[in-house]
Amino acid sequence: MTRPTLSAIGLAVAAALSANAQAQQAAPGATTLDTVIVTGTRASDRTVLESTVPVDVLTAEDIRKAGVVNGELGSALQALLPSFNFPRQSNSGGADHIRAAQLRGLSPDQVLVLVNGKRRHTSALVNTDSKIGKGTTPVDFNSIPINAIKRIEVLRDGAGAQYGSDAIAGVINVILDDNPERGELEASFGAYNTDVEPINRRVTDGQTSYASAKVGTLLGDDGGFFKVGLELKNREATNRAGFDQIPPFEEQTPANLALAGRRNYVLGDGATKGLNAWLNTKVPFSANGEFYAFGTYNQRDTEGANYFRYPDGSANWREIYPNGYRPISEGENRDLQIVAGARGQLGDWDYDASVNYGRNDFTYRLRNSLNASLGPGSTTRFKTGDFAFAQTVANLDLTRVFDAAGATHTFGTGAEFRREQYRTHAGDPASYAAGPFTDRPTGSQAGGGLSPQDEADLSRNVASAYANVSSQFGDKFSTDLAGRYEHYQDFGSQWTGKLAARYAFAPAFALRGAVSNNVRAPSLSQIGYEATSTGYDAAGRLTQGRLLSVYNPIARALGATDLKPEKSLNYSLGFTSQLGDHFDLSLDFFQIDIDDRIALSEDITGTALTDFVQQNFGVSGVQSASYFLNAADTRTRGAELVGNWRQYAFGGDLLLTGTYSYAKTELKNVIGTPAQLLALDPDYVLFGIEESNTLTDAAPRTRAALAANWNNEHWNLQTRVNRYGSATRVFDFGGGFVPRQTYGAEWQLDLEAEYHLGAQWTLAIGGQNILDNYSDRSIDDIAYFGNLPYDVLSPIGSNGAYWYGRVRYTF
């Protein structure tokens, strides 16, 4: 594979710095240390440098450039944040449609996402087939429009006492554009152009078109405004599959063998069409108060890959597919958030009262499929299920500044009420039916539909009260203290707290540290989601595989217990340094201990299970079962380094940024097999090798990046080098066959040149992964007989080099 050398990287940086200069101009994407932050503190004048915990600030310009591939916010965050992982999925069920993200190597549901400081809802779809994020319902970052963003603040520390459940790894706060006097039109087009080594062929695919517009207007003379925006995206599919060697367990018939050497599978991004819309507004109603509202809407139709079905396999009828077929999953994703409130000042107090409604609806479909048990008359299109999650939040925040004990204190208190609702609905009857052909698999191929017995309808209320105070003791010492009481209708009460402090020993050097305890309550989907797969055994008897709710009586009899909240204890210690106006550096060490991490159990299988369920519940043919459980206690230790150097050079402004992150997760304790299962079979294991691998080393532990940005009146030149650390994949196929592969570290080089034609027009060309680098090829035991030569674990992905052009008009 291609690997960039240091000389190649050096040439790229030199090229970015050698352009002709016209005049000095501030780098549009540069984040300065005097940027005032609003995340993680009550103080209204804290800057990035003065924060008691690490906070990254990403500007709209940073995000716009980094998200040029597919117009994805998640991809932009991965490019810009070394502790953020956003792997590309393929052949991974629901994860092909809603990608999960990690912060500090932790689970996707252990990071809290805010929009304008208000809690963002999660997706409705449970990831049960992916590696990263298995068993979670993550926030869908790609449902947030890129052109709506003013900046993003990323708090890299536990913040449950300040923001509530989920903020174990940190908080990502998306601040929306509030400049009504600037409008913008933008369009871009790009595609992958790459050498696909497994097929020895150069390929151009993944053509992506993106268009956006936003416009605003002032409302009155008192600071009111209204701003609205729209994005349209269209992405064609990519494919990096290899040549099929025909698995030996398939029928070795002439029709099947005739497909050898062809590309029957797909490995890559699915086709996507999407629309994003947003608004942001405020209207003063008095000299000291204003109404505000904002919202986002996402409508996205996606496709996902699935394994090929051979012509003479039992999953096919040649009357329908004479040459075999590959089912295509379709996702219909609809996402909405709308927030309205009032804020202002009453006497010495600032207030903010709001209502926040968020909802995600996901419909899962299959086409180019069939239900083989229904015979050659089977339909080929199915709806396999509907999923919905809704969240309503009411907040009241009060803040007051006062002086006492020789210090300035910003005291905040408030209350929050949250209602969550989760529902699933069965798919088409044909998607889960067991037809008359008992020698054929049942249900729609590539995932049987939810049946009526799987349907869920859950809701709960959550109430909380909180208080925090940010204090400034002179010029050197500052603190943040927070406490929160949270009561869950289904889990009872939880207390969280946080103490953070910073001391400046000199203008150029300060120490900071924090300790906090945090909580993540089990999601409603982890509590109530169920799914059933059906089939026939060799004797033609109906069989079932069940993913069971922990409240299902069968699961209880197999050792399931009520899920407990995940609880963490977070420690951090670091320093910040600023040397003049040119150089700043921060280094932070952290430890996160998490008890009772939630995961999906391994499949419980065998005749002992089948007989037990039949005898005790009268349900026949249950050949496998699984459920969610509090699987393990973990410890994550790591460090994060960020450095910036600014200099006027070569006739323009130069910004060099270097970052490094390290996070290693180890298992402290693993749940034992319950007595109920040991009585059935002493070899049963609930939390095994594969799930241990998912928590510990399936994601890279290290990440390093070096970026250079140079600009003057007409040019903005940027280059970025990323190094992604190694990741390990482990499969447990049973019978002692446990293939393992560690995929080595990879480098990625990105370049962009942008030219300003006057004050309004901007043209740009660029490339990402321009050296066309790929991850290591998978070994034979993992590559599925040549069909899947690359793994989805590496953040560099398996698409190769991407080239693009962009035009923007501002007014």
Language model feature labels by segment:
Residues 45, 65, 74-123:
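Extracytoplasmic beta-strand/coil segments of soluble accessory domains associated
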